[in-house]
Amino acid sequence: MPNVEADDIELARLFQDMPGTIPLYRAFETCLLDQHPDAGLRVQKTQVTFTCPRVFACASLLRARRKAELPDPYLTITLGLGHRLDSPRVDQASEPYPGRWTHHLVIGSIDEIDNELMTWVDEAYRFARDK
């Protein structure tokens, strides 16, 4: 899988309603690709999808909190794991299939792209890769 940054034009389109999110997204993308240089990415209409080759993480403007509770700017990170995360940082969690949990985490600053978050990203990467 190629290690390429998401196309600026496609990102501008994705984040057109909240362009202040782009630096936050770029910081997350950089950390993720530094940790997993073999990860692929696709900029889609509503999200950026990270693959290995299965999807293990997404970045989007999904409203995982009430609008009044969202930071400005914000980015929602979605991770697929084999268990439910027990953390106040998780805004929403669901089990769409037995043994597969989808977690949505809203971040509002680069400081929130920390060791804890990137440990969960790594766990999601390994979970998707080893399926």
PLM features per residue range, with description:
Residues 1, 77-79, 121:
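Conserved short hydrophobic patches within well-ordered secondary structure
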Residues 1-31, 36-43, 47:
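Charge-rich, low-complexity N-terminal segments
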Residues 15, 40-41, 91, 110, ...:
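Alpha-helical interaction segments
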Residues 24, 28, 55, 117-120:
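Amphipathic alpha-helical interface surfaces
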Residues 37, 82, 129:
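Residue-level marker of positions within ordered structural domains that often coincide
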Residues 42-102:
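Short, conserved beta-strand/beta-arch hydrophobic-aromatic motifs that form part
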Residues 96-131:
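Well-ordered alpha/beta subsegment
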